[in-house]
């Protein structure tokens, strides 16, 4: 499928009624040591049981209204890294195009949105499920809209993940 066709199919995915999981972990200190570990919330445990060994595509917004705001983009990347680490720490196999892309972008010239979406959508095809990190204004992200459209066409299960407190 040509990714450009996905851009011309606007759908309001915020009203689709996807399952929502509040992924939060609580720091726990054991009696036998001062070491802390993160105990997953009941909702996080339900998410683990739901996805099993599936490979998750973690979709998250990078731009705001189609433009990159430097500080906001940095905050979104950091929030995505935190969620990526949380999910991996819970034993979930997960891929994040934002973390992957921002990690390698300094090694070449800026390729632009269409170049990145080409590779992101290739990776989405390889994943079993799509989870959207519900950062502010995620519904307005063109990239997320395209990812959800392709996931819907491919009949991949879609989840919304809220950042835990």
Q: What are the functions of these language-model segments?
A:
Residues 2-165:
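Conserved catalytic or regulatory cores that recognize and/or transform ribose-phosphate-containing ligands
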